[in-house]
Amino acid sequence: MKRIVSAALVAVAALVASPASFAAVPEKGSIAIFAGIGPAIPFEGDYEVGFHLEAGGEYYLSNVLALRGTLGLTRSNADGGSGVTLGGLEASAAYYARRGKWSPYVLGGVGIHTVDPPGRGASQRLSAHVGGGTEYYLDRRTALTGEVIGRFVGSAGGRTSSFASLAVGIKYHF
């Protein structure tokens, strides 16, 4: 048993500790594209947990600071069988703290969402969002991503449309 634990610790250490040259270090002016999917957790009790899809791109102002544009689609059912659909366009600033294969980050920004609540017509709402996540580099250009973002959209149709998204995805650096 002691041998198995030691072997497992060595394997984990080998995966986590990698040469810094293995992971991509974006330079000023480089770009990346990404896509993600995961649950959307509404802040309002009348909505159920839904799903969130997103795709976008980043432009690096330096090796640790990027501007991000994101297109998103969120769908959640409500009590009574109908649901809410949100489509959004967001602009963010992201700060990365690179650590070998791992690259944790924080981000924040603003956006505009089209909200189509149950029983009402669609309307546009300004929003703010904050969150963070991490990237795990598979090679110099490709990374798996995981993030949690709180999106504060406001009310539409008498209910708040704000939610938290947990997304896993992939990112490719050019």
Q: What feature does the model see in each segment?
A:
Residues 1-28:
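Cleavable N-terminal export/targeting peptides
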Residues 37, 71, 148:
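A cross-domain feature marking catalytic cores of carbohydrate-active enzymes
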Residues 51-131, 136-145, 166-174:
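Gram-negative (and chloroplast) outer-membrane scaffold detector with strong preference
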Residues 25-41, 104-106:
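Transmembrane beta-strand segments of Gram-negative outer membrane beta-barrel proteins
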